[in-house]
Curated annotation (Swiss-Prot):
It holds the Pfam family BacA. It is a multi-pass membrane protein. It comes from Methanococcoides burtonii (strain DSM 6242 / NBRC 107633 / OCM 468 / ACE-M). This is Undecaprenyl-diphosphatase. It is found in: Cell membrane. The chain crosses the membrane at residues 42-62, 90-110, 115-135, 160-182, 195-215, 222-242, 245-265. Catalyzes the dephosphorylation of undecaprenyl diphosphate (UPP). PANTHER family: UNDECAPRENYL-DIPHOSPHATASE. GO terms for cellular component: plasma membrane. Belongs to the UppP family.
Amino acid sequence: MLSLSEAIILGIVQGLAEWLPISSEGMTSLVMVTFFGRSLSEAIPISIWLHLGTLLAAIVYFREDVKVLLYGVPDYVRSFSRKQPHDPVISFLLISTALTGIVGLPLLLFVTDNVEISGGSATAVIGIMLIVTGILQRTVSRDESLSRVPGMSDSLVSGVAQGFAAIPGISRSGITMSALLLRKFDAADAIRLSFLMSIPAVLVAEIGVGLMGMVELDINSIVGLFFAFAFGLVTIDLFLKVAKKVDFSYFCIGLGVLSVLTMFL
């Protein structure tokens, strides 16, 4: 599936790009299409596989949040009348994950089954989606936001938004944080909820990819996973702080334009 050098490079790219609103799937797919000669339908399952590495890094980083939520699940299931402080977040994750699957699975199947483009055309498709991501980020204001617990409408909007991240070039963190900011969450809560909702969504995606036999597991794919985890764990704290302060919309738009232009070179 991957050579050793490809696995290492892709793992590093995934580990670095996951925490920034620039589409790690788009970045790894762009590398595979541009430099490794893969088609877009070949690149996407590999990109999803590498997300498992950064998922593990996110679980380690958000371990206290994850622990509280897991401990709260039994009480959440047993009683809906005796509400606990973490219940709104559990409901948010359950509903948003379900919506992500409903929206994202058909998109993933369509792209992997019907989009056999490669080379400049595939690069241009990813570039267009990066431009869309950048424009979306430009339209979102971080002013007049507040810290609050998520509700039903927040779950619906965020879950649908996350589903569209199945399209390479659409940043999962970028589109979900944008959705949460539009719902008037402050930046810190938007980032925290965005990455918490990525944990069940990525787990479900990994199970789906595995059941459909879309990824061939070998030693090199494990190496790629390890590098994604290691670089993700080392960079997550710094990059999340950077993501709160830096506007990455121009990066997405600029890289997207360059990617589209490669089709004509």
